[in-house]
Amino acid sequence: MMTQSIRRSMLTVMATLPLLFSSATLHAQANSVQQQLEALEKSSGGRLGVALINTADNSQILYRADERFAMCSTSKVMAAAAVLKQSESDKHLLNQRVEIKKSDLVNYNPIAEKHVNGTMTLAELGAAALQYSDNTAMNKLIAHLGGPDKVTAFARSLGDETFRLDRTEPTLNTAIPGDPRDTTTPLAMAQTLKNLTLGKALAETQRAQLVTWLKGNTTGSASIRAGLPKSWVVGDKTGSGDYGTTNDIAVIWPENHAPLVLVTYFTQPEQKAERRRDILAAAAKIVTHGF
């Protein structure tokens, strides 16, 4: 005859089993993701950094997420956000006009070059920098703020102690291995991007503007977006530089799920290496599987 004590013990074990199996399943899934990212990196011949934040519960998927990578044009998000922050106390700021001279043009200016000998508003410069990765637009934003160090100072004001912007376009894209200039880590960037787009780092109007710019990006179709279901909404900012450096940072709205924040950074040992957007797409597919 089963004693009351034994019955209680069996009930305790039975109640615990689902938790144990659930924990074991999650652990196995995490190991599988890490192994897949490691295999992807090995096949690429480069160095891959990934940070995903699931805002439903703030769980994370991390791979080399505390290592420094050159940001390249993903740093444009911070510069644009810094200008948006200023506009919180000056409602006319984004309409301020900035002169565009031929001597301002650098190596990639798809929007600014159309305004030579004219002007662009700070809002237009923000859109050009984030949606078309216009380098002259980025330099104008940096100049307005007072230099690269002011962009870094804005990051510090958000609690980001890792981000550092040292130069302007196009030299910030040299991405020399081991060079700490113009770098951050995947995790630091993911946390800051989350704060800027989904948190309280910006006021509601400015936050909505930043998200609108990111959703309207024209340069990311072959990167993170390519690894996600077509029905998901994505706002992202790409970046690329020497050493085959290929980056993309994104806020993702899956169907019937809280937003995800994903940072993918990739670089290679050879200075003239080709960009590998396919690696970013593959990484995105791996870490978002199951959402």
From Swiss-Prot:
It comes from Escherichia coli. Belongs to the class-A beta-lactamase family. Monomer. GO terms for biological process: beta-lactam antibiotic catabolic process; response to antibiotic. Substrate binds at residues 237-239. Keywords: Antibiotic resistance, Hydrolase, Plasmid, Signal. This is Beta-lactamase Toho-1. Disulfide bonds: none annotated. The gene is bla. InterPro entries: Beta-lactam/transpept-like, Beta-lactam_cat, Beta-lactam_class-A, Beta-lactam_class-A_AS. It holds the Pfam family Beta-lactamase2.
